[in-house]
């Protein structure tokens, strides 16, 4: 058994004696959530419902033995800092956050309350944990986009759009882990010869998305896009996919949120697996597990999602090799 899996199994066994019956007599546990998209967003509402279902399977029912509060931060770093301060002020049993940006904001406010991140691309390099196997602090969670995946995104882009000669790498340096440096280093190291040529496209406000991508497109033919994991572009997924479509640029995205909103293709850790792991860790921490001893988990399965309508609009045909490997084809 893998060491991380063994550690989790031991944590489960060690806490099982507490039992659900004993838990029901205790005051309701409290979770504070800090996320970047509104709860009425169709993708978010579906995933929230799934998380509640998984928690209920483990004996945690909202309104009975569980109280959950939500904070959605706005468009600026000031809003994010305010949201982080508010969830810390609630002094909950756990703070659950979505991305690296939210994790950093909350950890700047507390090193005491357990913090569980849903996705952090480089938790060690970002200073969230001391090591993956033993975080040794008040934060742990999951990572479904390792920097090594950037090479895979480029491979997929070349496969679906073989005429691509220039790749624009889109990200916000303020909300991407290490300002995108770890991803860019992997991309450049994987390049052979002069092609593809990489160009950074930095976007720091919604209005810049279309403008900066248009600037890249205007430099010549053969352009394509790779979007880095980034809470800013995630929040503005519809603007990102609309710009790529308007400018007829094939693009690969780091989350299926983009393909569900018209993007061409995404490759990332399976969302269902992340939800299952998140519910499992919430359960463990609420039952007394030490967050410092819960290893950071990585996705074990990955999902290739292709939007066939977007491909057709770009004049691209899906090769059989991609059709076979895709877990979902949206048509």
Question: Which role fits each region the language model picked out?
Answer:
Residues 1-331:
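Short hydrophobic alpha-helices and adjacent helix-cap/hinge residues
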